[in-house]
């Protein structure tokens, strides 16, 4: 039996995954906040793929080291990250009202891109809760050191999130798939009153790019080229197919697992 864990508390991602028919639990990752890493030098696609891996690995590593599971129980951890980019420049969540205005002004009357990166980590029962991990396992030792550092030095950069996952992947003991999708969104021209009205709502302030395509901003969407759900936070069609590929790959894991 395979259980799914979404490494996000996003209501929009929860809704999309639920509509695909999967039963899952949520375990939000705090890895991005822990890392305090500057991703500004990365292209949009590179950033979402790297962050999706970090989020999934953060939850997966905790699961591997702490979760006691029933025999035959496996997990797929799903991490995701979404950014809006205009002229290849990433627009984060607006910091305040003026930042939201700047973003909407930059997006209105033109097209922009939305990227979502997703990482799937398949964890068989044999590597959960220390099962299959020897005490002298160098990846386990490394992770324990990092975990102690995290407890002792809150706020320090944790650049090694994913080390345990990378090690297990190299040994063919788990499966990791990272991918991304791009959707082109065209926005109608907006006048000052429309912009002012929109940023006066609460909608822009927890959204990448300062807008919610499924909310009031839908009135200003001219057309979409690509997957609509990708803009909301998860590329539903691609995600479903990638999960199917994960199951195909499970037969290639080491026989000792």
Please report, for each region that a protein language model flagged, where it lies by residue:
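Short beta-strand segments
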Residues: 78-79, 117-119, 214
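GST superfamily/GST-like fold recognition
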Residues: 2, 6-19, 110, 146, ...
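Active-site-adjacent loop/tail segments of enzyme domains
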Residues: 47, 82-112, 187-189
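Short beta-strand-to-turn element immediately C-terminal to the catalytic PLP-Schiff-base lysine
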Residues: 85, 121-123, 221-223
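N-terminal polybasic phosphate/anion-binding patch
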Residues: 1-76, 87-90, 128, 145, ...
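Residue-level signal for inorganic ion chemistry
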Residues: 17, 52, 81, 100, ...
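A short beta-strand signature
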Residues: 113-123
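Internal, charge-rich low-complexity segments
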Residues: 122-156
């Amino acid at each position: 039996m395979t259980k799914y864990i979404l490494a996000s508390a996003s209501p929009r991602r929860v809704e999309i995954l639920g509509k695909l028919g999967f039963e899952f639990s949520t375990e939000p990752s705090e890895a991005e906040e822990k890392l305090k890493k500057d991703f500004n030098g990365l292209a949009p696609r590179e950033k979402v793929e790297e962050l999706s891996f970090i989020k999934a690995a953060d939850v997966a590593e905790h699961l591997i080291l702490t979760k006691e599971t029933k025999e035959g129980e496996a997990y797929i951890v799903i991490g995701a990250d979404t950014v809006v980019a205009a002229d290849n420049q990433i627009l984060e969540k607006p910091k305040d009202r003026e930042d939201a205005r700047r973003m909407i002004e930059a997006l209105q009357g033109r097209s922009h891109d939305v990227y979502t990166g997703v990482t799937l980590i398949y964890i068989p029962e044999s590597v959960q809760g220390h099962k299959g991990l020897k005490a002298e396992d160098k990846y386990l030792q490394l992770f324990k050191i990092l975990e102690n550092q995290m407890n002792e030095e809150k706020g320090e950069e944790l650049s090694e999130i994913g080390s345990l996952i990378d090690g297990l992947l190299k040994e063919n003991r788990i499966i990791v798939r990272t991918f991304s999708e791009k959707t082109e969104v065209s926005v109608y021209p907006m006048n000052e009153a429309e912009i002012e009205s929109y940023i006066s709502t609460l909608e822009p302030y927890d959204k990448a790019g300062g807008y919610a395509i499924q909310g009031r901003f839908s009135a200003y969407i001219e057309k979409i080229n690509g997957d609509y759900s990708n803009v909301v936070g998860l590329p539903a069609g691609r995600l479903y197919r990638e999960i199917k590929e994960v199951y195909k790959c499970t037969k290639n894991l080491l026989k000792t697992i």
